[in-house]
UniProtKB/Swiss-Prot annotation:
Membrane-crossing residue ranges in chain numbering: 8-28, 72-92, 146-166, 206-226
Protein name as catalogued: 3-oxo-5-alpha-steroid 4-dehydrogenase 2
Naturally occurring in which organism (per UniProt): Sus scrofa
Keyword annotations from UniProtKB, A to Z: Differentiation, Endoplasmic reticulum, Lipid metabolism, Membrane, Microsome, NADP, Oxidoreductase, Sexual differentiation, Transmembrane, Transmembrane helix
Gene Ontology CC terms: endoplasmic reticulum membrane
Family per record: Belongs to the steroid 5-alpha reductase family.
Name of the gene encoding the protein in the UniProt record: SRD5A2
PANTHER family xref list: 3-OXO-5-ALPHA-STEROID 4-DEHYDROGENASE, 3-OXO-5-ALPHA-STEROID 4-DEHYDROGENASE 2
Function of the molecule: Converts testosterone (T) into 5-alpha-dihydrotestosterone (DHT) and progesterone or corticosterone into their corresponding 5-alpha-3-oxosteroids. It plays a central role in sexual differentiation and androgen physiology.
Pfam families in the cross-refs: Steroid_dh
Reactions this protein catalyses: a 3-oxo-5alpha-steroid + NADP(+) = a 3-oxo-Delta(4)-steroid + NADPH + H(+); 17beta-hydroxy-5alpha-androstan-3-one + NADP(+) = testosterone + NADPH + H(+); 5alpha-pregnane-3,20-dione + NADP(+) = progesterone + NADPH + H(+)
Gene3D superfamilies cross-referenced by the UniProt entry: 1.20.120.1630
PROSITE patterns per record: S5A_REDUCTASE (PS50244)
Length: 254
């Protein structure tokens, strides 16, 4: 039996994403993992960072990839399946590459569970909308929104991957000490990796021209932007020689 688009869950899911982003800004507290594990969740049960990131990110790849697997195979299929393929590409990297290379601190299980639920819900929302609800004209591939959006997505993903590489090189295996990131966009901002991912999802929202993607981009801006702000404040307090001209997220501005 074919699946038909139901707008109510799409609207509810999009509203939930936007609300979560707004709540993150309202409370303005750092999430209790990474740099903030010891101060915010000292007694939490934890998993090794690699296992935790793998488990958390996995549903963001598996759920939409499973939806895509049921669609007709073609190199350049309908725009919706190509766009969902970009989403899957990001989370393939996060699940199978980033998680296996990260050298972060042990991860609190409570945040792993929250992240897992979020990733599953968001993966289902984006996949369901694009495959069963989205309608694009045949000329969407030549539309400026698609072209510019895909360009921003690829640019942001490149910035994100390169910035993560710089951060990994700051530590030897087993180290948990902090050093000042140098190079790439870290020359200008403390949250270069977060900026890259925000650019990705803004590009994705533009390319898909969809409410769920816009809501996810808004959530990413709020959540990752706030995390960049807290990282910047952390670095400024920890290092007396931290570059004075470096901003938190947006070069020369914020």
């Amino acid at each position: 039996m074919p699946v038909r688009c139901q707008q109510s869950p799409v609207l509810a899911g999009s509203a939930t994403l936007a609300a979560l982003g707004a709540l993150a800004l309202y409370f303005a507290e750092p999430s209790g993992y990474g740099k903030y594990t010891e101060s915010l969740t000292p007694a939490a049960i934890r998993l090794p960072a690699r296992a935790a990131w793998f488990l958390q990110e996995l549903p963001s790849f598996v759920v939409p990839a499973g939806i895509l697997a049921g669609q007709p195979r073609s190199l350049f299929g309908p725009p919706a399946t190509v766009l969902l393929g970009l989403f899957c590409a990001h989370y393939f990297h996060r699940t199978f590459v980033y998680s296996l290379l990260t050298r972060g601190r042990p991860f609190p299980v409570v945040f792993l569970f929250r992240g897992f639920v979020f990733c599953m819900g968001n993966g289902l929302l984006q996949g369901y909308y694009l495959v069963y609800c989205a309608e694009y004209p045949a000329e969407w591939y030549t539309d400026i929104r698609f072209s510019l959006g895909v360009f921003l997505f690829i640019l942001g993903m490149g910035i994100n991957i390169h910035s993560d590489y710089i951060l990994r090189q700051l530590r030897k295996p087993g180290e948990v000490i902090y050093k000042i990131p140098q190079g790439g966009l870290f020359t200008y901002v403390s949250g270069a990796n977060f900026l890259g991912e925000i650019i990705e999802w803004i590009g994705y929202a533009l390319a898909t021209w969809s409410l769920p993607a816009l809501a996810f981009a808004f959530f990413s801006l709020c959540f990752l932007g706030l995390r960049a702000f807290h990282h910047h404040r952390f670095y400024v307090k920890m290092f007396e020689d931290y570059p004075k001209s470096r901003k938190a997220l947006i070069p020369f501005i914020f």
